[in-house]
Amino acid sequence: HQQFRDLFLQRLVAPTDVGTDRGFDVVTLDDVVGDARHPFPVAHVAERTSWSCHHGVARWGAECPDAADGRWKAPLRAALERLAGAVDAITALTFREAIGEDPADARDAYVDVVLGRTTGAAFAAERWPTADEAVRRRLLDLLEAQRWRLAMFASDGWFWDDPIRPETRQVMRAAARAARLVDGLAGTRLEHTLVADLALLTSPSRG
């Protein structure tokens, strides 16, 4: 993501004359993922890299010159990082005390519930067969909190110029959902802290 690399890519994939061989094929993500005839390698995203402008990750936590006024981004990022830390700590502690496990594998597998491939009850029964119903329900609720904790970091929430946009409001809603779920389970006041932290950011257009 360096300056003018977008022009390079534009020229690279520009339509060619019929019969001209580029030496490579232009494909979409659907072309790759939709081909189930053979497996494809896992892609790893390098830390502190971005898919947008050449200013890099500043777009997602500081003031990027390509956005008119990014002073609201650092307080928002700090608020969500603080909430994420609390949600993770409570989730890890509860899983450890209830079933003696780290929650990471269950969190990743919970996507099957989110996508409707299985029900929460079936998921819990398969993963925690010796746990009683109350424990299973509590662990499922924490995985749901983890779902929203991940959703609140959706990158489009920081991409634009103003936090009043729907993308940023959506990440705040996700954060509130995660906080409320954990507060209901653990008796914490994460939503109260989140609201106080979010009060530090202002909208360039509305103050």
Model-derived features with residue positions:
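Active-site and substrate-binding clefts of carbohydrate-active enzymes
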Residues: 1-207
